[in-house]
Amino acid sequence: MPFVIYLLALCITAQGTSEFMLSGVLPSIAHSLGLQLATAGTLVSAFAIGLIIGAPLMSMTTLKLPRKTALIGFQLVFIAAHVGAALVPSFGFLLLMRLLSAVAYAGFWSLALVAAVSLVDADKQGRAVSVVISGLSVATIVGVPGGTLLAQHAGWQTAFWAVAAMTALTAVAVLIALPGSRGTATAPPRLATELRSLKQPRLWVAYCTATLTMAANFAIFSYLGAILEDVTGLSTGLVPLVLVLFGVGAFIGLTIGGRVADRAPFALLLVGMGGFAVVAVALAMAAHVAWATIVLVVLMGATIFGVTPAVNARVFSILGDTNTLGGAVTVAAFNVGIAVAPLVSGLVIGTRLGLAGTAWIGAAFAVAHMGSVLLDRHLTRRHEAGTAALTAASEPAACSAT
């Protein structure tokens, strides 16, 4: 893999820490600002909504810009939003800053994925994507627990300052190491061509799969810190360590998934999400048992991150070379799930199911995900059969013409 792909992964680690650390920081924010936990949970949804809007919007508005210029610009806006959030401890302003940082993060994500797949051959795109996404698993291993500890011992604002500092360092690295050209592209993408690429029905099924992937995860992960403290009964100091284990599982899943995604994407998606559904059901029933919960958290990270390279590989396989806007819509699709899931699973917290009930919601999303994958596989086989038939029909015509 080219070095630049690993640099992009490092950038995602810095920014992804902000996305994922809220699971552990939410209790501190809620306590500091006098909010209910479910109300503080809307910060997760706000960030996801910013990503949904920002991914296609930033992709279109920066279509003509050099990638290096756009990437650094997104990082600078992201830094400014985190500094603002740390300086003004108001829930309304914090919500606004989460939206702004998410828009910038979405733009960076979209360009990072497109840059990664453009630097490798088609049969290595899934692995390239897995390297970039591995930045998130590193964020869960190092950044998220670190953010949680900072929030617990120095205030949640300190965690935001730390994210801003890490992003600033990676922005300097991008400025130094990333070439100033567009990469392998010989001309800037055309918006009309990019829009036409979105007209494929099976592409939207793949987007649905992406949405359900993140919905399954964030239905549980958004409240995982609270589950570990209030249901499992772990001490506040142990919660960051369990989140580290989630990240370890995620890294293992990405390593395996990245190597399988290009060869057998459908099998990986079905087996991986089937495994996640089983893990979610087990968590719903055993969240009060500490050792079982810890094991299940590791498996949860491994299964959900294990399928993510295949989800992206499916989208980029359908899009082909016209992938700038389509890749951005993938980011938006993922974050529709992130936005909706905490709101849906939050509804069960006040029922007799309690916090552990969020795992049942995650399992339901996982089952729906498998249905979407089966539909995608059916449409793909029909598409391939149609393409083969057209090729076979054109060969006799070509022979007769000669």
Where do the PLM segments sit?
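Cytoplasmic helix-loop-helix junction between adjacent transmembrane helices
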Residues: 97-136
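Helix-breaking motifs and short loop linkers at transmembrane-helix boundaries and internal kinks
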Residues: 34, 66, 87-93, 233, ...
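Paired small-residue
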Residues: 77-84, 92-101, 291-299
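C-terminal transmembrane helical hairpin of 12-TM major facilitator-type secondary transporters
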Residues: 267-311
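Helix-loop-helix hairpin linking two adjacent transmembrane segments in secondary transporters
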Residues: 91-93, 122-179, 227
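Helix-to-loop junctions at the C-terminal end of transmembrane segments
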Residues: 54-67, 253-265, 349-350
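Structural signature of the two symmetry-related core transmembrane helices
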Residues: 69-83, 164, 267-282, 363
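Conserved MFS/SLC helix-loop-helix module at the cytosolic interface between two early adjacent transmembrane helices
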Residues: 53-92
